[in-house]
Amino acid sequence: MLRLGASVGVHQGSRILFSDFADGGQMWTGNGPREYRLDVTFPEPFTRTPAVTVGLSMWDMDHKTNSRMDIGAENITPQGFQIVFKTWGDTRIARVRADWLAIGSVRDDEDWEIE
């Protein structure tokens, strides 16, 4: 975790979500659910729910169909979140890579608890 000051931390990552053209998966064929979810667990948890952003860093698609997609973060907790990628209609997607960034409060060495 990168620390920005005493009590703010940053986690970041990059993941290939799917590669459906190789095996005729649902995002490529257009059959079945057109949603993919990936659980991300932070290597070190935050002390509170962080702010998380998700973006596309690679999008390989069929040029003969419309380009439609929605990507975001859901179910965010101090321990992790889900990347959610969706498409619809005639869109055919071969593969997608998503990058993410989480910023939030972390435990400081100077923190102490009173019981």
From Swiss-Prot:
Pfam families in the cross-refs: H_lectin (PF09458)
SUPFAM superfamilies given in the database record: Agglutinin HPA-like
InterPro entries reported for this sequence: Galactose-binding_lectin, H-type_lectin_dom_sf, H-type_lectin_domain
Top-level taxon of the source organism: Bacteria
Single GO cellular component term: cell surface
UniProt GO MF annotations: N-acetylgalactosamine binding; oligosaccharide binding; polysaccharide binding
GO biological processes: cell-cell adhesion
Signal peptide start-end: none
Protein name: ATP synthase subunits region ORF 7
Species, as recorded: Fuscovulum blasticum (Rhodobacter blasticus)
